[in-house]
Regions:
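Alpha-helical transmembrane segments of multi-pass membrane proteins predominantly involved
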Residues: 1-490
């Protein structure tokens, strides 16, 4: 009989507490849910879930020291603890603002399922970022992808949600196959699936290079990098707005951090190859997404291309290939979480009070009837565009500095790195144009039938307050960046 050392689970505290939250939510839903025809909103259920998530965050806000367990397959560190806290924080914001949507007649009978699926997705992401072995990494990735597909198709009778779910499943299946193909090549080249062992054995052979390219391509689908982005706009448009917000920040942030860690851990000796590949993908992602975003008329499709562009900026930090680069990437994800979720919270609120309309024209003259929402939307868009003094400007600055620092360290591709940074700066200016199109619509354009004045729900106000404070404080308070840098440097 195999003896299990249960003390190992102490080093998996984020997963243990998250599993406890998941079990409590499941039991509470099981014993309180009514039949769909008789179902009424449970006013106590959302506060319970949010309080449990807050407790989970507070327990894990001080990351545990670096440690490997379960035969070296699972690894934790201060940096991994920070990214898990950020992902849980983003999930909490989504849960807060989801209350109004989940209490509608079409969804109130499956409120519990939403929380269970979202928590399962978060648990898979936690396993993915802590993986020190490709098997555990793949299991975590699929554990996150399957519940996410259910969330995308959650509102299957409205807004093309079923179509979006089908496209997401096809994308997930194809990308997983491509990734497994690459992992099999890497195993053939090194004879191991452990990250650290693979790092010492891997050399730039054709088999290893092909494995790296296939693995990068598979994960590129998850992050929505060009040219692996074709599913993004349709999925974002068809999924429920709350789910779209969750998919755009939490899922993307986890995959981006995991890719950064694997490129540095496993492919450190092949940095010259993956940096060239990454630079091409970054330029395409930022440029093509910006050009497509300018012509969008649907706000959720617009945010899809904005998300693709933001993914390019996030990957720019990976070129730094240092503690500064990982810090910039993590800080960018944190700022992106609060700014993007603020936008999607407003989109969800306007959609709810405007008959499901998410077209750009619906925001014409919004300032006249709903000035507070217009003001918060402007702050969030300015942060996404990198306009000072908001946090988005500092996140882009740190990303550019990390990439430039990487260029100084690596003379071989230094000139190319500076060129990519310059192109990213030019695209930042271009992105201001299409973000300001929404601001122009809200404050300047006239609307013969403007959206009536409405009072947003208390949960929407709470979510927007948290996001707005984050946009303001994360930029002004240097402690946040210092906290992340200290965790990464340990």
């Amino acid at each position: 009989m195999m003896n299990i050392d249960y003390s190992q689970f102490f080093h998996m505290l984020p997963e243990v507490t998250l599993t406890a939250v998941l079990v409590i939510v499941f039991i509470a839903d099981l014993f309180s849910a009514a039949k769909p025809a008789e179902s009424k909103p449970r006013k106590w259920f959302n506060p319970l879930v949010c309080i449990l998530m807050l407790i989970h965050i507070l327990i894990n806000i001080f990351p545990v020291p670096a440690y490997e367990t379960f035969g070296g397959m699972y690894a934790t560190s201060h940096a991994i603890g920070v990214i898990k806290t950020i992902l849980a924080f983003g999930t909490l914001i989504v849960f807060i603002q989801a209350r109004e949507w989940l209490h509608s007649p079409d969804t109130c009978f499956k409120e519990g399922e939403f929380y269970i699926l979202a928590l399962s997705t978060l648990l898979g992401m936690n396993m993915m970022v802590s993986a020190n072995h490709f098997l555990l990494f793949f299991l975590g990735l699929e554990m996150a992808s399957v519940p996410m597909a259910c969330l995308v198709a959650f509102d299957k009778y409205r807004h093309n949600s079923a179509e979006a779910g089908a496209k997401f499943i096809l994308k997930a299946t194809f990308s997983s196959g491509v990734m497994l193909f690459g992992i099999s090549f890497l195993y053939g080249a090194t004879g191991t699936l452990y990250f650290e062992d693979m790092m010492t054995r891997i050399t730039a052979t054709p088999l290893a290079i092909m494995g790296m390219v296939f693995f990068f391509s598979g994960l590129g689908f998850k992050i929505s990098l060009v040219p692996f982005h074709f599913w993004t706009a349709d999925t974002y448009q068809g999924a429920p707005t709350t789910v779209t917000g969750y998919l755009s920040v939490v899922s993307k942030g986890a995959a981006a951090f995991a890719l950064c860690a694997i490129l540095i851990k496993v492919f450190g000796s092949m940095a010259l190859y993956w940096k060239y590949l990454l630079m091409v993908v970054i330029v395409m992602s930022i440029t093509i997404a910006n050009l497509f975003a300018i012509h969008q008329k649907d706000l959720k499709r617009f945010m899809a291309f904005s998300s693709i562009s933001q993914a390019g900026y996030i990957m720019l930090a990976v070129i730094g290939d240092s503690a500064m680069g990982v810090t910039a990437l993590t800080y960018y994800i944190l700022v992106y979480v609060v700014a993007n979720l603020a936008v999607f919270t407003i989109i969800s609120s306007v959609e709810e009070h405007n008959g499901g309309n998410v077209k750009m024209d619906a925001y014409n003259g919004l300032y006249q009837t709903n000035p507070r929402l217009s003001f918060i939307m402007t702050i969030a868009l300015f942060s996404l565009g990198g306009i000072p003094p908001f946090a988005g400007m500092f996140s882009k600055f740190f990303v550019f500095m990390a990439a430039a620092n990487g260029a100084q360290i690596t003379n071989t591709i230094g000139a190319w790195t500076y060129a990519v940074v310059f192109i990213a700066l030019v695209n930042t200016v271009i992105s201001l144009y299409y973000y300001l199109l929404i601001v122009k619509a809200m404050f300047i354009k006239h609307n013969d039938k403007p959206l009536p004045t409405f009072n947003a729900g208390i949960n929407t106000k709470m979510a927007l307050a948290v996001c707005t404070l984050g946009i303001a404080i994360f930029g002004v308070c240097s402690y946040v960046y210092d906290w992340i840098y200290a965790a990464v440097a340990m």
